[in-house]
Curated annotation (Swiss-Prot):
Alphabetical keyword list: ATP synthesis, Cell membrane, CF(1), Hydrogen ion transport, Ion transport, Membrane, Transport
Gene coding for it: atpG
Protein name per UniProt: ATP synthase gamma chain
Molecular function terms from GO: ATP binding; proton-transporting ATP synthase activity, rotational mechanism
Entry function: Produces ATP from ADP in the presence of a proton gradient across the membrane. The gamma chain is believed to be important in regulating ATPase activity and the flow of protons through the CF(0) complex.
Keyword Transport: yes
Main location: membrane
Organism per entry: Ureaplasma urealyticum serovar 10 (strain ATCC 33699 / Western)
Length: 286
C-alpha cells in the first residue's frame, strides 16, 4: 500500500470519527432533554395510576370492560426508533416481538424501524403504522390519538387485549424491553398497598358522577394515552442512550484505527527515507 493511499485512509477515518462524535453529542443533548421531560411527568403519571387504582378498587366488577364474543387475539403497540445507528436498541425490541406475537395478533407500529421489521417478517397483521418518532412528534396528543384507535378495536371486539412493547430505561448502559398489559385492567398492578386506607375511605365518602362504571369508561382513552406517553418517552430515552453509547464506541474505534494507520504510515515513510539515504550513500561511493 502506498503512502498516499494510507494518508487517504487516515483522513477518511478521522472524518468518520468527527461525524460519530457529533452524533454522540447530539444524542447526549437529546437524552438530557428527554430525561427532563420524563422527570416532569413522572409525578403526574404516578398520581394518575393511584387514582385509577383507587377507582378500580371500588368498582366491584370490571367484567363490563370485557367485550362479549371478542376475537381471541391481542393488539400490540410496539415502539421502535425512526433512525438507525442505535446499537442493539431496535434488535432487542424486534426480538421480543418475534417471540411473543402470534400471526393472528394485530400490531400498531411506532417508528420506521419497527415498520420495516414487520414488513420484512411478512407474517404479522399490521393495522396502523406511525413512521415518525422524532422529538417534535412525541406529544400527548399523538398518544391520545393512538389510544382512541386502539380502544376502538377493543370496543368492536376485534381484539380482547391491548399491550405495549417498549424499552424501559434503567441506567445509561442498561435497558430492558418490556411487554405491559394495558387492557383489561390489572388490579394487582394499579392498586398499591399504600392506598388501602384511602380506598376504605373512598368506598363511603367519595361520590362518583355519573357512576363508577361510566367514569371508568370515560377515562379509558386518557388512561391508555398516559401509559403510552410514558412508554414513548422512556423508549426515546433508551434509544438516545443506546445511540450515544454506540457512537462513543464508534468514535473510540475510529480514533484507534487512525492511530494504527499513522503507525503504518510512519513505518513505511521511515523505511522509504532509509532506502533513499542508502541509495545516496551507495551512489557517492561509486
Amino acid at each position: 500500500m502506498s503512502l498516499d493511499a494510507i494518508k487517504r485512509k487516515i483522513s477518511s477515518v478521522q472524518t468518520t470519527a468527527k461525524i460519530t462524535n457529533a452524533m454522540k453529542l447530539v444524542a447526549t443533548a437529546k437524552l438530557k432533554r428527554q430525561r427532563d421531560r420524563l422527570a416532569a411527568i413522572k409525578e403526574y403519571c404516578h398520581d394518575y395510576y393511584d387514582v385509577i387504582g383507587l377507582l378500580l378498587s371500588v368498582v366491584n366488577d370490571i367484567e363490563f370492560l370485557k367485550i362479549p364474543n371478542a376475537k381471541n387475539r391481542t393488539l400490540y403497540i410496539t415502539i421502535n426508533s425512526t433512525m438507525g445507528l442505535a446499537g442493539s436498541y431496535n434488535y432487542n425490541v424486534n426480538k421480543l416481538v418475534s417471540k411473543i406475537i402470534n400471526e393472528d395478533d394485530i400490531t400498531f407500529t411506532i417508528g420506521k424501524k419497527g415498520h420495516d421489521f414487520m414488513r420484512l417478517s411478512n407474517r404479522l397483521h399490521q393495522v396502523n403504522t406511525y413512521l415518525n418518532l422524532n422529538d417534535n412528534d412525541l406529544t400527548f396528543d399523538m398518544s391520545l390519538q393512538i389510544a382512541r384507535e386502539a380502544l376502538e378495536l377493543y370496543s368492536n371486539g376485534e381484539v380482547n387485549k391491548i399491550c405495549i412493547i417498549y424499552t424501559k430505561f434503567i441506567n445509561a448502559i442498561t435497558f430492558e424491553v418490556n411487554n405491559i398489559d394495558v387492557l383489561p385492567f390489572d388490579k394487582t398492578v394499579l392498586t398499591k398497598d399504600n392506598l388501602a386506607e384511602t380506598i376504605e375511605l373512598a368506598k363511603d365518602n367519595i361520590i362518583f358522577q355519573p357512576n363508577k362504571v361510566e367514569l371508568v369508561k370515560k377515562i379509558l382513552p386518557t388512561y391508555i394515552a398516559t401509559v403510552l406517553y410514558g412508554s414513548l418517552i422512556e423508549s426515546k430515552i433508551s434509544e438516545n442512550a443506546s445511540r450515544r453509547n454506540a457512537m462513543d464506541a464508534a468514535t473510540k474505534n475510529a480514533k484507534a484505527l487512525a492511530e494504527d494507520y499513522k503507525l503504518i504510515y510512519n513505518t513505511l515513510r521511515q523505511g522509504k527515507i532509509t532506502r533513499e539515504i542508502t541509495e545516496i550513500v551507495a551512489g557517492s561511493d561509486d
